[in-house]
Amino acid sequence: MTAKEYINRRAALVGQAMKINKKFFPRCVKAKLRQIARLENEYRGADYETRKNELYKEWFN
């Protein structure tokens, strides 16, 4: 995966997550955050669980 592909895919996932009303659909938002964490794990080699938890804290606090 190239840097441009990563940026485009991540931007699309973040955009989709931002459009979801997290008050009524928190599980859907968490699913998108898991996809973002999985993508970052694949591209950057970041630890999936750690990054997933960081994203949860960032989006839900």
Give each language-model segment a name:
Residues 1-8, 21:
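Short, charge/polar-rich alpha-helical segments
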Residues 12-60:
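Acidic, low-complexity, intrinsically disordered interaction modules
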